[in-house]
Amino acid sequence: MVGSFLLPLTTTLALRALGYAFPVPALGAVASLLFLFNEGNSMWGGNIPSTLAGEFSHSLGFGLAVLFVGLLYRRIESGRGWRSLAAILALAGLSHPVAFINGAAPGLFFLFDRQRFAANLRYLATVYLTAVLLMGFWLLPLVAKLGYATSINWTWNFTSWHELLPRILWPVAPLAALDALWVVVRPSPANRPGRYVLFSIVITAIAFYDATSVGLPEIRFVPFAQFLVILLALDLVARPLVRVPAAALPALALAAATVAWVQSSITYVPSWIKWNYEGFERKDTYPTLQRITEALRGKLQDPRIAYENSPLYERFGSMRVWEGLPRFSGRATLEGLLLQTPVTSPFIYYLQSLISTQGTGVIPGYFYPSVDPKRGTPRLDLFNARDMLAITPGVKKALDEDPRWQRTLDLPPYAIYHRKDLDGHYVRVPHYRPVMVETSRWKRDFHRWFTTDAALEVPIVAADSVPAAERTRFPLTSRSPTELPHVRLDGHCDIEEHLSHLQIEFTTTCPGLPHWIAVSYFPNWQVEGASRVYLASPAFMLVFPDRPHVRLTYRRITVDWLGIGASLVGLALCLTPARRRQVEVGEPAALDRRLNALRPYLVVAAVLVVLLATAGNVARAVLPRPIYMRGWRAFEKQEYARAIPYFEMATRLGGNSYPAAEGTFFRAASLLRMGKPAAALEGYRALTERFPDNVWVVESYYHVGLCLRQLGRLREAKAAFRYVTLSYPENRWAGFATDQLKQLREEARVRRTRG
C-alpha cells in the first residue's frame, strides 16, 4: 500500500511545484482521496481497489509519475535539478512502464514554447535519456528479449460512461470542464499551470488510443487521466481561493466536504482491506488450505501441480491462492512469477480452459476451448504435471471416469488427482523426430500445434531459429505446424535429471538424439554438453547432447551486461558534481539558434505524425465492425460482388480483431458463391493462417476441401476433409467432411466400374 499512502504527499509536492500557493497543495492531498477511493474499477491501476487486486507496483509508479509531472514544470524553467528528476522518472518506470509514459508524455508541452524551445528540448532530452540509462539494467534486456514475451494489449469494451466517470468523480468533472474552457479561451501566464494539466490530459488520451498498437493495455492510461481531471478542477478552485482572506477556512470546509463525499461513496474497500490483510491464517478455511498443501508437498525436482481455475477459491483469501503453491508446497505449478506475459502463457491459458469449468482466456487473439479434461490430460503430461486439484463437479466427474487419473484426496468440494503412469521427467526423448517448420509467426504456429491433438507428440522448431550449419539435425520439414510427418525415434533411453532454480543437469544414455526439456525457453539458458539450445514447441527447450552429461545454466548474456553498464553510466551522470551552467539556457547558442529555426517544422511534423497515427488507431478500433456489417447486409441479400469490398476493408483495418477474421471468412464465402473456387481457396487458407484460433477455422478447413473438390484436385480435397475429421472429431464440420469423403469414395468407385 506504499503507493496509496504516497499519492497524497506527491500530489501536494506536485501542486507546490506547479506554483499553487497554500492552501491549494494541502487541498490537493485531500482531493487525491477522490481518486484513491474510486470504486469504479479494480484493475485499471492507481486506486486502492486496483492495489488490493495486486496492482501495487503500478500504484507506486503512479505516485512517482504525479510527482515528476509537477517538478518538471518548475525545474525546466531554471534548467537545474535534472538529476533528481531523472531518478524519479526512472523509479516510476521501474515500477511500471505505463507510469513512465504517464510521467514523460506531459513534458511535450514545453516544446510548444517559442522562446525556450531549444533549451527545453535539451533539458527534456537530458532528463529522459538519463532516466533511460538508469533503467538500462532492466530496460535493455526487456527490449532485446521482447519477442519471448506475450502481449496482453487487450482492448477494453466500455459498457457505460459511468466507467470513465464514476460517481465519486461527479463533483469534479464539471469544475474541470469549466476550467478547461477558461484556460483555452483566456490564455495567459497565470493560466499556464492549468493549460499544462489540460495538455497532460490530452496527451494521456492520445496514449490511450495508441497503446494497443505498441503492445500495451490501453485501459492503464485511464486512471492518470482521471487523476489529472481532479487537478484541473483544483486549478479552477484555486483561482478564487487564493484571493480570499483567511483562505485556510474555506479550504478547510472544502476539505471536510471532500472527505464526507468520499466517505459516502465508499462501499466495499474497508471490507476488502480487512479481507486482504488479515492473512490466510485468519480465514475459516485455513485448516483446509493446510491439508491441501500438505497433500501436495514436495520439492522443485518433483513433477508440477495443476489446478482448476475457479472463483470458488476466493474463500481461502484469493482465487489466485494456488499461485503460491511453490511457496506453500515446495513444488512448481504451470505458472511462473509472471502469470500473463511469459512466452508460455497462451498455452497455459488454453490448457487451463480445458481443465476448468471457468477458464480465464485473458490473452487476446487466441481461441480458448470449452472444458474437456480428457483433451487436457496429454497437455498436462507435456508439462510434466502429475497432480491436479479440482473443485467443480463436472471436472471431478471427468477425472473420476478417466482411468489415467486416481483420486488421492477427497476433501469436498476439493479433490486431488494423481496422474498414473507418468514418467515424471522434465527431460525426455520425444517419441517422434522433431520437425522444422517454415513459419514467420512462430508464436501463432506453435499455438496451432498445441491445439492440435494429433501433433502433440511431434516437437516442432521454427526454421528461422536454426542456423544453416545445424539444419542437418532436422531432416524433417513442414510448412504446416499441424500436418507433420511422424517418424518414430527408436531406442530406449535412461535419463537422470536434477533441477534447481537456475540450472538443469541430466545424464542420458542417448547422446545425439533430441532431448525435449519441459521448461520455458529463454535466451539466457546456456548449455554445456550440446551445441546450442533450440526453442521448441510449445515454448520448451530442445538440445542434441554431444556427450552423456549435459548442463543448462541460466546466466546473464551480453545484452544484460550492456544494460548494467548503461545503468552505471546513468548513476555516474547523476552522482558526478555539476559544472556551473551545465544545461542552462543559451548553451550552446549556435545549436539553439538552429533548433529554434527548425522549431515550427519539427513541431508541425511531430503533431501531424501523432495525429495521423492516432487517427489510424482510432479508425482500426472503431470502423471494422460497422464496415463489416455493411458487407454482411449485402451478403445476406446475395449481393456478393458488393459485399466483397466491405469485407476487404474490414480485414485491412481490423488487424487481428474478430471483425477482420469475419471479413476474411465471408470474403472467401462470397467468392465461392460467385463460382470462383480458386480465389475462395486462397481466402479460406488466408483465414486459417492469419487467424488460426478463430471460430471460423474449422469451417474454413472444410471449405478448403470443398474448393479443391470443385477445382478437380481430388487427392488434395480428400486430405483436407480427412484433416478436419482427425483434428476436430467433435465438431459438426467433421461430420460434413465425413460425408464428403463418402461421396468422393463413391465417385471413385463409379469411375473404376465404368473404366
What is the predicted role of each segment?
Residues L9, P97, A260-G512, W516-S520, ...:
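Extracytoplasmic
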Residues V466-N596:
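Active-site-proximal, structured, solvent-exposed surfaces of multi-pass membrane proteins
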